[in-house]
Amino acid sequence: MLEETDRQVDNARTRVTRHRLAPGAHTGMHRHEDDYVVVPVTDGRMRILEAGKELFADLESGVAYFRPAGVEHDVFNGGDRELVFVEVELLR
């Protein structure tokens, strides 16, 4: 897996984690219990395995997107450079 994570905030309302994925690295299959927002720090291509499907997303640095809770997925760096993003979980 070659992933590095850095938990930056962890309190009753939010959990903020920076993820660094080397080319080909992945997060491992997981599920978020709460809604969350992802903010890419670098441009890059993300490969996502979700619900038996393979999806691709081209990320643009600074352009955030929302994801709902409950979807099991594995995120891969689908590019040839390090992929860095910040994940903001909105805890209930």
Where do the language-model regions lie?
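Ligand-binding loop in jelly-roll beta-barrel domains
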Residues: 69-91
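Local beta-strand/beta-hairpin segments that build beta-sheet-rich folds
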Residues: 2-9
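Short, conserved beta-strand element in jelly-roll/cupin
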Residues: 31-47
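Conserved hydrophobic/aromatic beta-strand scaffold that supports enzyme active sites
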Residues: 7, 16-20, 64-66, 85-87
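Residue-level marker of beta-strand positions
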Residues: 26, 45, 63-64
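Conserved short histidine dyad/triad with adjacent acidic residue
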Residues: 15-32, 49-51, 68-69
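Short acidic-glycine-tyrosine-enriched beta hairpin
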Residues: 13, 52-70
